[in-house]
From Swiss-Prot:
Protein name: Large ribosomal subunit protein uL22
Keywords noted in UniProt: Ribonucleoprotein, Ribosomal protein, RNA-binding, rRNA-binding
Pfam families documented for this protein: Ribosomal_L22
Similarity-based family: Belongs to the universal ribosomal protein uL22 family.
């Protein structure tokens, strides 16, 4: 079993979880092919982490299965947006932590 972690990525964890659920339990090669044609930013980021997990184990992509793809919430980046009459509104930009584990197919 090998794993890869990407932390503090500027990405909404809610949107990333939608992609992560789709590839869990899939063959890594199929998952990478599927992620390549998804139009989301999260798909591109998760594809890189999956490829890294496969490479960390020294495996070939067609011989491993994604056992777990977990997305956790990171800290929010706090920003301010100027508003009318000298006021300001707080903007919260979410970050995410991505954990991917792959295991050799048996």
């Amino acid at each position: 079993m090998s794993k890869a972690v990407l932390k503090f990525i500027r990405l909404s964890p809610t949107k990333a979880r939608l992609i992560a659920k789709e590839i869990q339990g899939m063959n890594a090669e199929e998952a990478l092919a599927k992620l390549e044609f998804m139009p989301n930013k999260a798909a591109r980021v998760i594809a890189k982490v999956v490829a890294s997990a496969v490479a960390n184990g020294g495996y070939d992509a067609n011989e491993v299965v994604i056992t777990s793809c977990r997305i956790d919430r990171g800290p929010y980046l706090k920003r301010f947006r100027p508003r009318a009459r000298g006021m300001a509104s707080r903007i919260q930009k979410p970050t995410a932590h991505i954990f991917v584990e792959v295991e050799k197919e048996s």
